[in-house]
Regions:
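Short, acidic/hydrophobic/Gly-rich beta-strand patch recurrent on exposed beta strands
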Residues: 20-26, 149-152, 217-219, 362
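Structural signature of eukaryotic scaffold interfaces centered on beta-propeller domains
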Residues: 206-208
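Extended interfacial segments that mediate partner engagement and assembly in macromolecular machines
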Residues: 62-74, 80-190, 210
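Terminal RNA-binding accessory module
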Residues: 1-74, 78, 153, 375, ...
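Short, solvent-exposed loop/turn elements at beta->coil junctions and helix N-caps
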Residues: 119-126, 193, 202, 452-455
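Rossmann-like S-adenosyl-L-methionine
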Residues: 2-3, 10-16, 224-471
């Protein structure tokens, strides 16, 4: 096999989260294993060999030659085009079967025969479950049709129409199609990052699954740069006209906020230089397990609220006895969701989170829920545990819910040295969990109970929840 050549083969398995294992037999009859991202079990694919070193071969997917036996016609026209869903045409039960096998394989060295396994729990809703989406104004290809949608898989520039995205809330589709048509009719161009021309950048939408409250935020340049094509006053009038047009639409939910975010940053990200409320308010309320949470445009909050209830119920059940009247650390606490769910039974809960805005939101939400035994600290977990060593009471149990990269080695060692009887590790990336388990095991902890929650149906994502016990 030679680098740069195109080969075909069948995908025999898939590693977490999207690494298809393709086997190719060369002219000498020797079988070669090649990892091809986004190639799915059962498919026959064509790929270009991009890496061949020390027995590790990688390929770039070029074409699906034959569908998998597990595939049907996908419910989304952008299947395989956008970077969202990995399994758009697969039967849902098959997708969770694949994810379950992937995580079990990663954790096999840490799962003894007596470990209690609670299985993989499905999301209560599999379609339209996302309560937050960030859409980009752009063109389908260079100088192609203008569109409001999602980035094409593997592209920084090409955008695909996402008005009928399967996993986004139904109201988002109406917002996208209407907004796209509104500005197309007005002849307003999108912002060209390389040329610094144009006005429109993003559309940020959020919705609460329980309350139905809906927020729409349009992101544009300020108009201070004359190359934008419109000045600040013209952009302001345009945004107000857009707002008025939204108020005439019939949503399933209730539109409670229309915002205008100004962003002059060169980065292709939603960065807020200034935010104006055009209608309603710049926040809404979501409910989880009987508690209320105030959500702003930039709040970190689970995108699948109903799935989050399943996950957090699992966390609570694992340490319910330890929490009763005890002191709890909720590390990497985000907006303090887990902390507040555990707080009613605990003596005290201390949350640590590096994002200051999230900490302020956690404090505000705790006050909203009448919880006086929650304390939230802003800072890096390791540094906080080091600097507050004398003032923090030793915990009776610990919950860690780190970002995708997992817990850093210094922080993990510090956490394990508390020596609590039980810990819960919530992981959104099973490879990071498997890596961290090596140190966790070495420090005398083992998994005694675990389960998974499919928070993100049809994507490669899966949440894993492990109860760890000190031997």
């Amino acid at each position: 096999m030679k680098k740069g050549e195109v080969y075909t083969g069948y995908v025999e398995s898939i590693g977490f989260p999207n690494k298809g294992c393709v086997y190719v037999t060369d002219e000498d009859g020797e079988r070669h294993r090649v990892t091809v991202k986004n190639a799915l079990p059962g498919q026959k694919v064509a790929f270009r060999l991009t890496k061949k070193r020390n027995g590790n071969s990688e390929g770039l997917l070029k074409e699906v030659v034959e569908k998998s036996e597990f595939e049907t016609d996908p419910a989304c026209k952008n299947a395989g085009k956008c970077g969202g869903c990995l399994y758009p045409g697969f039967d849902y039960e098959k997708t969770i079967e694949i994810k379950e096998a992937q995580v079990k394989k990663l954790l096999e060295n840490y799962l003894s025969d007596d470990v209690i396994y609670d299985g993989i729990k499905s999301s209560p809703v599999c379609d339209g479950y996302r309560g937050k989406m960030e859409y980009t104004f752009g063109d389908e290809f260079l100088d192609g049709p203008k569109v409001l949608g999602l980035h094409k898989r593997g592209s920084f520039h090409d955008i695909v129409d996402a008005s009928d995205c399967r996993i986004a809330d139904e109201d988002f589709g109406l917002l996208v199609s209407h907004t796209s048509g509104f500005f197309s009719e007005k002849g307003v161009d999108f912002y060209h990052r390389m040329k610094h021309t144009g006005v429109l950048r993003h559309l940020l939408v959020r919705k609460a699954a329980k309350t139905g409250e809906l927020m729409a935020a349009l992101v544009t340049v300020s108009g201070k740069d004359t190359m934008a094509g419109l000045d600040s006053d013209e952009i302001e009038r345009l945004c107000n006209d857009w707002k008025e047009s939204l108020l005439s639409l019939k949503f399933k939910g209730k539109l409670t906020g229309v915002l205008h975010i100004i962003n002059d940053s060169p980065a292709d990200a939603i960065i807020c230089d200034r935010m104006d409320v055009l209608y309603g308010k710049d926040w809404f309320t979501e409910e989880l397990l009987g508690l209320k949470f105030k959500i702003t445009p930039f709040s970190f909050f689970q995108t699948n609220s109903l799935g989050a209830e399943v996950l957090y119920s699992l966390v609570r059940s694992y340490i319910s006895e330890d929490v009763k009247g005890g002191k709890v650390f909720d590390l990497y606490s985000g907006t303090g969701t887990i902390a507040q769910i555990l707080a009613p039974a605990a003596k005290k809960v201390t949350g640590v989170e590096i994002v200051e805005e999230a900490v302020e939101a956690a404090k505000e939400n705790a006050k909203l829920n009448g919880l006086e035994n929650c304390d939230f600290i802003a800072g890096d977990v390791f540094k906080v545990l080091e600097s507050y060593a004398d003032s923090l009471d030793s915990p009776d149990c610990i919950v860690v819910d780190p970002p995708r990269d997992g817990v850093g080695p210094k922080a993990l060692l510090k956490i394990l040295n508390y020596g609590v009887k039980h810990m819960v590790y919530v992981s959104c990336k099973a490879t990071s969990l498997a890596r961290d388990m090596e140190m966790i095991n070495a420090k005398g902890y083992r998994i005694v109970r675990w389960g998974m929650v499919d928070m993100f149906p049809f994507t490669g994502g899966i949440e894993t929840c492990c109860l760890l016990e000190r031997l």
